[in-house]
Amino acid sequence: MDSPTILTPRDWPSHPAYVHPDYRSSVKRGPTRPMIPLKERLRDQYAPVYGAEDLGPLDHDLTKNAVKNGEPLGERIVVTGRVLDEGGKPVRNTLVEVWQANAAGRYVHKVDQHDAPLDPNFLGAGRCMTDAEGRYRFLTIKPGAYPWGNHPNAWRPNHIHFSLFGDYFGSRLVTQMYFPGDPLLAYDPIFQGTPEAARDRLISRFSLDTTEEGHALGYEFDIVLRGRDATPMER
C-alpha cells in the first residue's frame, strides 16, 4: 500500500498570475489585494468520491455520447495520459472531466455567439475515472480555434478544458490542454500568461502508439496535480 502523499505549498511561480494585463478579463476579475493564507483543515485533505456507477457507458466517448442522427464532424482523436500526485504516484479512481468546442470552434451554450455551425451530434463534454495506474482516456473530436475579442484579430488556440479533484480538495485543478505545433500559441495571452518554464506542461504530445489505425490520431497528456512539476492551472 502506498504511503500517503504530504501536501506541500503550491509552487505558485509555475502558475499564471491572477492578473495578466494582456488577458483583459483577468484585469477586471482578478484580486486587487494580497491573498490571505488559510490554515489547512480536515476538509482540505479529502475530496468527493466518485465511482464507476456514477458514469454512463459512453461518458468517455465524446464522438458517441450525444449522437442524434449521425456521426459528429471533424478529426477524431484519442486523448489519454496519467494523473499523478506531487510525489509522482498515480492518482487512482479519480474523476476526470473535459469540455471543449466542436470542430468549427463553437461551444454548446447560449453565451457563445461565434458565427460557426453547431454540430447536432456533438455536445463537447465528457468524463471518466482513472484506472489503477492513474490513466484516463477520451475519444473525441479535435476542437477548432475561435475568435474571442480580447484584442484585434484574437483567436484561441485549439484546446480542451480539464477538471480534476484528485484525492484532496487541496489538489483541485482546472486547466487547459493544447496541441503541439499550434501557431496560435505564440499569440494567446492565456497560454502566454503561464510562466515560460511551465508552458510545455500544457501541450500534449502526439503519440503513434496511442493512435488508432484508420480511426483516430492519438495524443498523450499527463497531469500532475501539485508540486514542483504541477500542471499549471487555468485562471
From Swiss-Prot:
The UniProt GO MF terms for this protein read:
ferric iron binding; protocatechuate 3,4-dioxygenase activity
What's its catalytic activity? 3,4-dihydroxybenzoate + O2 = 3-carboxy-cis,cis-muconate + 2 H(+)
- Cofactor requirements of the protein: Fe(3+)
Q: Which GO terms describe its biological process?
A: 3,4-dihydroxybenzoate catabolic process; beta-ketoadipate pathway
Residues engaged in binding Fe cation: 107, 146, 159, 161
E.C. number(s) listed in UniProt: 1.13.11.3
Q: Which PROSITE patterns match?
A: INTRADIOL_DIOXYGENAS
* Catalytic EC class: oxidoreductase
Domain of life where this protein originates: Bacteria
Q: Which SUPFAM superfamilies match?
A: Aromatic compound dioxygenase
What family, per the record?
Belongs to the intradiol ring-cleavage dioxygenase family.
Q: What does this protein do?
A: Plays an essential role in the utilization of numerous aromatic and hydroaromatic compounds via the beta-ketoadipate pathway.
Name of the featured protein: Protocatechuate 3,4-dioxygenase beta chain
The species this protein belongs to is: Burkholderia cepacia
